[in-house]
């Protein structure tokens, strides 16, 4: 796997969620992602970036345009130093929410991408890495 370009984008306030969506849309377009796949990726970004702000107290989105077997993709890691997720199994259940949301953020995001990895612990923050291939 090779990495073409990468960077970090702050996700500290609600406005950063919009900017993260715009950045990822551009990255996906530049690597030739089909509109349907681009839309799925941007929707997942919206959910995860919003969770980073609302539940994680803000954090960062690390991004990379990558290639594997001549297939480009976008890999994103959302990380925060918030309270973490005490029960991952429960959090990954459709309809469950720790706040006022619909409870579709994590499970919805997972369904919209090709790869989804969640690393969290109470008091240690949360790190979610997603990848969408073209």
Where are the model-predicted features located?
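Glycine-rich phosphate-binding loop
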Residues: 98-114
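Flexible, glycine-/charge-rich segments associated with ATP-binding catalytic modules
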Residues: 1-14, 110-134
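ATP-lid-like helix-loop hinge signature
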Residues: 52-72, 77
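Glycine-rich/acidic phosphate-handling loop/turn and adjacent ATP-lid/helix
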Residues: 68-102
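Conserved ATP-binding N-box helix of the HATPase_c
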Residues: 35-61
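Solvent-exposed beta-strand sheet faces enriched in polar/charged residues
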Residues: 62-64, 79, 119, 131
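Bergerat-fold GHKL ATPase/HATPase_c domain
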Residues: 1-43
